């Protein structure tokens, strides 16, 4: 099984030294991601493409899915490589592969060629296309908008019949740009802004300001873990949790109501700047969009930036909410975001849209900054890969079982895509499909006389969700530890 990885076009127009560095980094990223799932994978870089091979044909769907999420890949071709001697050899091998595909359809042949041959690419297209047209009576050549395009790459003494073309996410390889710290709340905006910086080549770390207790933190961890695993699993990143409940309490007690929103955001960027400086991170990322809420006017954003000691990046600054939600749906964070409460917007009933610097500074003079310092000093730092281990400790009270009783119902909480790829089948067992992001709104609708055993592939999300449901008062939840 072989894939040809085509690079993001902006990589190709870089200087030779920069392009080589980017390709080297992308090659390493691909290897890091794929080797976790398939130890037979070999990744080889070339001047203008990267070659990926695997001996495990059963991993095809998984590898296609993983490659489609790695930043730096514009698209990739699934190819079948065969040796040839003459142009007629290429035709015969192509015929055996595509004859059934072009029956009763229009088709054309497109050839790309490298190396020395006694024929041109156009000669090959005409010869192979003419041969297919004669061999398959019901097929018809049509050069413009055919039903089937037969694509062949010829390189030296080998031909590669392109079985499929898959789109990548583009962007730059992670590690080609400097690290950033994303202020993630679990909502639509922060998840999308994190993804956009990942796609642009930065390693994105996550900073979460907890305003809503353990349940809120669990939800945000789910989103951060989802984004990391899906799009940046090639790199280690940090998840930083800062308890901001006392900071909010101090603001509510001492700051004028209309100024609370801006003051809270200023406290957040102050804290995030300290975290960024500690780890040598160059910028912090927020999901703010111009005019979306009262604190996001140009005047207010300028005042927020003045409190930061790091560069503040806002990749969504010109995006509409509709665009943001569409992107969240595309990257798989929409449903998680739907279940997240918005805390920042509710602390002020009459927020100012045009804050005055002198007024903000006066209100902040009433604030006890030792509260902020304490919050930063007591921040929790976690390797995002350790979320699984931390979850095991947090959900010790949730039963993990291997043997099911008559009253147990398996709740498969994987995403629909995961279920389609690898359906869960246990003879004689009742299985309900309910993606993890729907549990908060739909679990109560289930028959509560039953015990529900949560299942996911690696057990991380099932344990997080079990803890979440326990905190909501549902005691009839367990975790499926192993399928025998």
UniProtKB/Swiss-Prot annotation:
InterPro entries per record: Rhodanese-like_dom (IPR001763), Rhodanese-like_dom_sf (IPR036873), Rossmann-like_a/b/a_fold (IPR014729), ThiI_AANH (IPR020536), ThiI_fer (IPR054173), ThiI_N (IPR049961), THII_Thiazole_biosynth_dom (IPR026340), THUMP_dom (IPR004114)
Record localization: Cytoplasm
GO biological process terms on file: thiamine biosynthetic process; thiamine diphosphate biosynthetic process; thiazole biosynthetic process; tRNA 4-thiouridine biosynthesis
Listed GO CC annotations: cytosol
Domain annotation Rhodanese: ranges: 404-484
Active site: 456 (cysteine persulfide intermediate)
Domain THUMP: 61-165
This protein's pathway: Cofactor biosynthesis; thiamine diphosphate biosynthesis
Disulfide bonds, paired cysteine numbers: 344-456
A Pfam family it matches: THUMP
GO molecular function: ATP binding; CCA tRNA nucleotidyltransferase activity; tRNA binding; tRNA-uracil-4 sulfurtransferase activity
Keyword Glycoprotein tagged: no
Enzyme class: transferase
Residues where ATP binds: 183-184, 265, 287, 296
Keywords (A to Z) from UniProt: ATP-binding, Cytoplasm, Disulfide bond, Nucleotide-binding, Redox-active center, RNA-binding, Thiamine biosynthesis, Transferase, tRNA-binding
EC number(s) stated in the UniProt entry for this protein: 2.8.1.4
The reaction(s) this protein catalyses: [ThiI sulfur-carrier protein]-S-sulfanyl-L-cysteine + a uridine in tRNA + 2 reduced [2Fe-2S]-[ferredoxin] + ATP + H(+) = [ThiI sulfur-carrier protein]-L-cysteine + a 4-thiouridine in tRNA + 2 oxidized [2Fe-2S]-[ferredoxin] + AMP + diphosphate; [ThiS sulfur-carrier protein]-C-terminal Gly-Gly-AMP + S-sulfanyl-L-cysteinyl-[cysteine desulfurase] + AH2 = [ThiS sulfur-carrier protein]-C-terminal-Gly-aminoethanethioate + L-cysteinyl-[cysteine desulfurase] + A + AMP + 2 H(+)
Entry annotated with the keyword Transmembrane: no
Domain of life from the UniProt record: Bacteria
Family note: Belongs to the ThiI family.
HAMAP family given in the database record: ThiI (MF_00021)
Entry-linked NCBIfam families: ThiI_C_thiazole, tRNA uracil 4-sulfurtransferase ThiI
Primary role: Catalyzes the ATP-dependent transfer of a sulfur to tRNA to produce 4-thiouridine in position 8 of tRNAs, which functions as a near-UV photosensor. Also catalyzes the transfer of sulfur to the sulfur carrier protein ThiS, forming ThiS-thiocarboxylate. This is a step in the synthesis of thiazole, in the thiamine biosynthesis pathway. The sulfur is donated as persulfide by IscS.
UniProt name for this protein: tRNA sulfurtransferase
Organism: Histophilus somni (strain 129Pt) (Haemophilus somnus)
Annotated gene: thiI
């Amino acid at each position: 099984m072989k894939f040809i990885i085509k690079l993001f076009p902006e990589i190709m127009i870089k200087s030779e030294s920069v392009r080589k560095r980017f390709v080297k980094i992308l090659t390493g990223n691909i290897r890091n991601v794929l080797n976790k799932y398939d130890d037979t994978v070999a990744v080889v870089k070339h001047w203008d493409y990267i070659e990926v091979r695997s001996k495990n044909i059963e991993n095809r769907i998984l590898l296609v899915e993983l490659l489609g999420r790695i930043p730096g890949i514009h698209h990739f071709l699934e190819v079948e490589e065969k040796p040839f001697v003459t142009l007629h050899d290429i035709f015969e091998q192509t015929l055996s592969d595509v004859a059934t595909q072009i029956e009763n359809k229009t088709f054309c042949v497109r050839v790309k060629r490298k190396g020395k041959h006694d024929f041109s690419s156009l000669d090959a297209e005409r010869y192979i296309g003419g041969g297919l047209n004669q061999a398959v009576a019901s097929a018809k050549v049509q050069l413009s908008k055919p039903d089937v395009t037969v694509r062949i790459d010829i390189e030296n003494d080998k031909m590669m019949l392109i079985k499929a073309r898959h789109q990548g996410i583009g962007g730059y390889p992670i590690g080609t740009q400097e690290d950033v710290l994303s202020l993630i709340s679990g909502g639509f905006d922060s998840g999308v802004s994190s993804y956009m910086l990942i796609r642009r080549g930065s390693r994105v770390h996550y900073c979460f300001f907890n305003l809503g207790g353990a349940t809120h933190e669990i939800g945000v961890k789910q989103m951060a873990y989802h984004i990391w695993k899906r799009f940046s699993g090639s790199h280690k990143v940090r998840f930083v949790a800062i308890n901001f409940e006392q900071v909010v309490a101090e603001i509510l007690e001492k700051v004028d109501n209309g100024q609370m929103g801006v003051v809270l955001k200023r406290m957040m960027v102050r804290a995030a700047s300290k975290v960024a400086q500690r780890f040598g991170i160059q910028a912090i990322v927020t999901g703010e969009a111009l005019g979306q809420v009262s604190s996001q006017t140009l005047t207010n954003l300028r005042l927020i930036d003045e409190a930061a000691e790091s560069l503040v990046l806002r990749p969504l600054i010109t995006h509409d909410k509709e665009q943001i939600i569409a992107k969240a749906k595309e990257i798989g964070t929409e449903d998680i975001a739907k279940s997240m409460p918005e805390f920042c917007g509710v602390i002020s009933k009459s927020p100012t849209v045009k804050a005055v610097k002198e007024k903000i500074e006066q209100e902040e003079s009433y604030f006890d900054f030792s509260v902020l310092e304490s919050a930063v000093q007591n921040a929790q730092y976690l390797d995002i890969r350790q979320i699984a281990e931390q979850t095991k400790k947090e959900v010790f009270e949730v039963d993990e079982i291997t043997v099911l009783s008559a009253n147990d119902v398996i709740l498969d909480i994987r995403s629909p895509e995961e279920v389609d790829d690898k359906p869960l089948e246990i003879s004689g067992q009742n299985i309900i499909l309910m993606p993890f992001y729907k549990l908060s709104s739909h679990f109560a609708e289930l028959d509560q006389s039953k015990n529900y055993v949560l299942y996911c592939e690696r057990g991380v999300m099932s344990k997080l969700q079990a803890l979440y449901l326990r905190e909501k008062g549902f005691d009839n939840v367990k975790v499926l530890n192993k399928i025998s």
